[in-house]
Regions:
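N-terminal cap/lid segment of alpha/beta-hydrolase-fold proteins
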Residues: 2-47
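The alpha/beta-hydrolase serine catalytic core
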Residues: 13, 24, 146-208
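Active-site glycine-rich loops that stabilize anionic/oxyanionic intermediates
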Residues: 49, 56-60
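Structural cue for short, hydrophobic secondary-structure segments
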Residues: 54-57, 80
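Conserved alpha/beta-hydrolase
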Residues: 68, 72-88
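Alpha/beta-hydrolase active-site loop
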Residues: 93-118
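Alpha/beta-hydrolase fold nucleophile elbow
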Residues: 117-131
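Short glycine-enriched nucleophile-adjacent loop
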Residues: 134-144
Length: 208
């Protein structure tokens, strides 16, 4: 199926054979449940669409559901996972864990049974990430050779932020900790420093 950008800001014609739908999903990752939504365009029973793993920013205050709806209108299947430790998913939130959750979600989307259920073209899978979700998207892409592309919006460069000092990240963590399940603000800051060393800043090429 081709994209139809005229429908980004308006609903397409109702298709009674298979109307557009929104479904919940959950996955197991390291013994904890990841929850999220799948938005599926309406169409014929045999239609398949490119798939998007849409990754939200640092948990607690913002959602990308409006963007997911616009992408679905244009003809994309949009999977939006909620990382462990936030928005109802089990476990504790860490930056490294969020990358792992993104990889787990994309791998699930790439499975034949999932693609069949949600009308996904397995050969056309992409990441889109906003803010911290951009950082997560880039680093999840590095681990999955079959991802076709990645788009980021206002990405937060967690690995490169050391050049600006720790104050901004410390403030970000302490503002968000009350609405997440974390071990502690200090543990999350330590995980961020581990990510700095392990994944590298955005200026590092995705592929060499």
């Amino acid at each position: 199926m081709s994209l139809d950008l005229q429908y980004i800001s308006q609903d397409p014609q109702h298709l009674p054979e298979r109307p557009a739908s929104t479904e919940g999903f959950f996955l197991e990752n390291h013994g904890e449940s990841i929850f999220g939504t799948v938005l599926i365009p309406g169409g014929a029973a045999v239609d398949v669409y490119p798939g998007i793993v849409l990754l939200h920013g640092f948990p607690g205050y913002t959602s990308t559901f409006d963007l997911a709806q616009n992408l679905r209108r244009a003809g994309l299947v949009v999977v939006s996972p909620y990382y462990r430790g936030c928005w109802g998913s089990g476990g504790r939130y860490t930056f490294s864990g969020a990358i792992d959750d993104a990889v787990r979600t994309a791998s699930w989307m790439h499975e034949e049974s999932t693609a069949k259920t949600y009308h996904v073209d397995r050969d056309k899978l992409f990441f889109i990430g906003h803010s911290m979700g951009g950082f997560i998207s880039v680093n999840a892409t590095r681990r999955l050779s079959w991802i076709k592309g990645t788009a980021v919006m206002s990405p937060y460069d967690l690995a490169g932020r050391a050049e600006a000092g720790d104050a901004a990240l410390d403030q970000l963590i302490r503002e968000s900790v009350p609405v997440m399940n974390v071990e502690s603000a200090e543990a999350l800051a330590a995980d961020a420093k581990m990510c700095e060393k392990k994944v590298g800043p955005f200026r590092t090429p995705l592929k060499t």
